[in-house]
């Protein structure tokens, strides 16, 4: 478990609403892509229903915003391309280095 400083925690809580809205915007664009497919309306409906339910589940898991889960939430936003490591430049060097290390380790696992 990581304990980041109070400044990082306050900055995270400040940026969180913007990041969440960016994530919702990304999801809405993806939903529009599903609706715009050249398939049967019922197929689009059920595909969208399945996708929304899956996204709701992930959002509920991420809804556990606490200082002890801050790194997990940040990595989730990075993994889903809501933010990048550059969005963390205002955070402490410790947090930035920690996130960079996690991204490097997990990209090795997922990429190869």
Model-derived segments and spans:
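Acidic, Ser/Pro/Thr-rich low-complexity regulatory regions
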Residues: 1-112
């Amino acid at each position: 478990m990581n304990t980041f400083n109070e400044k990082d925690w306050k900055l995270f809580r400040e940026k969180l609403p913007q990041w969440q809205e960016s994530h919702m915007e990304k999801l809405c664009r993806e939903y529009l892509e599903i609706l715009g497919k050249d398939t049967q309306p019922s197929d689009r409906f059920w595909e969208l229903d399945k996708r929304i339910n899956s996204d709701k589940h992930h959002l509920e898991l991420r809804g556990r915003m606490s200082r002890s889960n801050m790194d997990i939430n940040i990595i989730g936003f990075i993994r889903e391309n809501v933010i990048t490591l550059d969005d963390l430049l205002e955070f402490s060097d410790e947090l930035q280095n920690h996130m960079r290390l996690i991204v490097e380790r997990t990209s090795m696992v997922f990429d190869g």
